[in-house]
């Protein structure tokens, strides 16, 4: 899971992206398919730990998250992501920019933990409910126990017999 770390410095400027090739406007014609750029989670499963860590933003930035009561909380600073075992013993930790979503750090944390411990289960909350994380966990022969994220108002209750 992650926690906020407030920073005193100003939030850093985003790297201005290089000029992108202009895309064709409008809807694609029949039979035409446009390439989608792969998301960060799609790339992380095949890359090394070093490349995954270098891809994550590490500068001071604004972050926002909802607490358990639904109240939004925002801060300027960083986010500390920690991978723990039973008894809240930390195995690996990564400090990222506050704007990085928790799910984007799940695979690098798992890669760091692989070299340190052997585990059979991956227990995560609803923020990590992504097919890429499920597939990565199953590929390592772990059993993913990830709470379902209620998308569009429908929450699936976890049934232990089916998971």
Language model regions located:
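Generic hydrophobic, helix-prone segments enriched in Leu/Val/Ile
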Residues: 120-121, 161-163
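Short, charged, surface-exposed secondary-structure boundary motifs
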Residues: 153-161
């Amino acid at each position: 899971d992650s926690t906020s770390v407030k920073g005193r410095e100003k939030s850093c400027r985003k790297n201005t992206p290089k000029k992108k090739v202009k895309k064709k406007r409008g809807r694609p014609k029949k039979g035409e398919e446009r390439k989608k750029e792969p998301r960060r989670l799609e790339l992380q499963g095949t890359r090394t730990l070093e490349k995954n860590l270098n891809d994550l933003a590490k500068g001071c930035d604004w972050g926002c998250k909802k607490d358990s009561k639904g109240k939004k909380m925002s801060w300027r600073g960083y986010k500390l992501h920690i991978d723990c075992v039973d008894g809240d013993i930390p195995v690996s930790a990564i400090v990222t920019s506050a704007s990085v979503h928790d799910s984007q750090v799940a695979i690098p944390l798992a890669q760091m933990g692989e070299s340190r411990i052997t585990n059979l289960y991956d227990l995560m909350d609803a923020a990590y409910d992504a097919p890429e994380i499920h597939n990565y966990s199953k590929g390592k022969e772990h059993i993913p126990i990830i709470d379902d994220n209620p998308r569009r108002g429908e929450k699936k209750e976890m049934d232990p017999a089916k998971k």
